[in-house]
UniProtKB/Swiss-Prot annotation:
Key words of the record: ATP-binding, Magnesium, Nucleotide-binding, Transferase, tRNA processing
Residue positions binding substrate: T13, A14, V15, G16, K17, T18
This protein's name: tRNA dimethylallyltransferase
EC number: 2.5.1.75
Family statement drawn from the similarity comment of this UniProt entry: Belongs to the IPP transferase family.
InterPro entries: Dimethylallyltransferase, IPT, P-loop_NTPase
Function recorded in the entry: Catalyzes the transfer of a dimethylallyl group onto the adenine at position 37 in tRNAs that read codons beginning with uridine, leading to the formation of N6-(dimethylallyl)adenosine (i(6)A).
UniProt-annotated stretches for the region Interaction with substrate tRNA: 36-39
Binding site for ATP: G11, P12, T13, A14, V15, G16, K17, T18
Swiss-Prot/TrEMBL catalytic activity: adenosine(37) in tRNA + dimethylallyl diphosphate = N(6)-dimethylallyladenosine(37) in tRNA + diphosphate
SUPFAM superfamilies: P-loop containing nucleoside triphosphate hydrolases
Length: 305
């Protein structure tokens, strides 16, 4: 049986992945699967820079708004769902296109990740629960920098799980999870968008400013009022930074600057992770030739049977 071709567009936040994916889908008769761990949640629209129906431009999208913020959507769940939708899109005679910045989720689709059979150490986990999230993430960064590059400091639950797995097995969480052999079912082309660091950071700052103009504070306040302050859905950047403001512990400007700072750091970690963990064909973003170069690489890839 021939392998299913899949175009995968990755890169840091605010680099232009969404607009490129729409253009490629139009020209290559594709449908798009979101590879973003946050855009699966309903109601998390502004803070996740979720694509709007207008921006979709009649291109069918999958794995957007599929669960409530109170329900965790794990990498294992993403793996299962994405593989299902790849098959569905392919059977319909369309080209599956995955776009997103959550490297662990995307990689899990194409490599045979093991999500799971390490048991728990409840006593050790209870000890870790007593530590603050910054210290926990620093512990992870020292012991397993690859996992730390992918897991955000705010995601305390996942940081603790990574430390727990290392405690129980003696090997890094990142090594435990992935077998570096591509799954035989798919033939992926990984296209990465890169941008001058200063320009990328300016884009990020501008995006955060726009989020505030579009109502990010109201969106975050709804989560806060629903007591959804510790669920994985709000561990992403853009929500928890506002909670101290709601509690009168920081100013709105301080919250905005913290979101911008955390977003810049996250973009840097994304780039590091993609460069170290996946074989990616990199394209310069933000120039007049970006779309043409991506289309040329995709058409060449698809022409090889």
């Amino acid at each position: 049986m021939s392998k299913i071709p899949v175009i995968v567009i990755v890169g840091p936040t605010a680099v232009g992945k969404t607009s490129l994916s729409i253009e490629l889908a139009k020209k290559l008769d594709g449908e798009i699967i979101s590879g973003d761990s946050m855009q699966v949640y309903r109601g998390l629209d502004i803070g996740t820079a979720k694509i709007t129906p207008e921006e979709m431009d009649e291109i069918k999208h999958y794995l957007i708004d599929v669960t409530d913020p109170s329900e965790p959507f794990t990498a294992a769940k993403f793996q299962t769902e994405t593989r299902k939708w790849i098959e569905t899109i392919h059977q319909a005679g369309k080209l599956p296109i995955i776009v997103g910045g959550t490297g662990l989720y995307i990689q899990s689709v194409f490599y045979d990740y093991d999500f799971g059979n390490v048991s728990e150490d409840k006593a050790y986990r209870a000890e870790l629960e007593q530590l603050n999230k910054t210290l926990l993430w620093q512990m992870l960064e020292q012991q397993d920098p690859e996992s730390a590059a992918q897991i955000h400091e705010n995601n305390k639950r996942r940081v603790i799980r990574a430390l727990e797995v290392m405690h129980l097995t003696g090997k890094p969480f990142s090594e435990y999870q992935v077998h570096n052999v591509l799954n035989d079912t798919y033939k992926p082309l990984f296209l990465g968008l890169d941008l001058d660091r200063a320009l990328l950071y300016e884009r990020i700052n501008q995006r955060v400013n726009l989020m505030f103009e579009e109502g990010l504070v109201t969106e975050a306040k709804k989560l806060y009022d629903q007591h959804l302050v510790d669920v994985p859905a709000v561990c992403g950047i853009g929500y928890k930074e506002l909670f101290p403001y709601f509690e009168g512990k920081s100013s709105l400007e301080e919250a905005k600057e913290l979101i911008q700072k955390n977003s810049r750091h996250f973009a840097k970690r994304q780039l590091t992770w993609f460069r170290n963990r996946m074989e990616i064909d990199w394209i310069q973003a933000g120039v007049s030739t970006t779309e043409a170069e991506a289309l040329n690489k995709a058409e060449t890839f698809l022409s090889v049977k």
